[in-house]
């Protein structure tokens, strides 16, 4: 018996059946492999504190330790015209507001001329010896181009701006999101106001949660 239209109710071709089964199996295996690839593919961190970086001694450090605090992330240099004023102001800010609720996080960068020529340890030692800084220093990084440090690229992608000189500053909230950024020559007083306001919010929130 044939169905309406003259088509047989069952396939009478064994080869066609085998081909259909084989095709179905191939598609199924392909879907499973695609799903496995997606599951195993490393996920891009969704916030700044989800990244790992190297400290000045080359040791891997998880930025997770700073979650719950405000962070001012800065690309620093030892031989820039702005070095002295920035290091002194940053240390004062770190001393006044940190480290319980706030930290300055310094990343030396050598992509702007000869303003940073030493090693990561040299940069840290210079800042400590010359300006008495106590905030954390990390390994020297690149912040521009294909070799940019992923953690710093997260900052620049967040604001759609790439630093054009040393001492750009990115304010990161307790959840790891960038809330403000400042260029090199912007007054520290405006930065201080923004950071202080964020730190106050953190303190008030913790008091409410107690």
UniProtKB/Swiss-Prot annotation:
Reaction(s) this enzyme catalyzes, per UniProt: 2 glutathione + H2O2 = glutathione disulfide + 2 H2O
Keyword field contains Cell division: no
Gene3D superfamilies, sorted: Glutaredoxin
Record field: transmembrane: 21-40
Pfam families: GSHPx (PF00255)
Principal location: membrane
Keyword Membrane: yes
InterPro entries in alphabetical order: Glut_perox_Gpx7, Glutathione_peroxidase, Thioredoxin-like_sf
GO BP annotations listed: response to oxidative stress
Signal peptide, first to last residue: none
Molecular function via GO: glutathione peroxidase activity
PANTHER family documented for this protein: GLUTATHIONE PEROXIDASE (PTHR11592), GLUTATHIONE PEROXIDASE 8-RELATED (PTHR11592:SF7)
Family classification: Belongs to the glutathione peroxidase family.
Protein name: Probable glutathione peroxidase 8
Taxonomy of the source species: Eukaryota, Metazoa, Chordata, Craniata, Vertebrata
Gene this chain is encoded by: gpx8
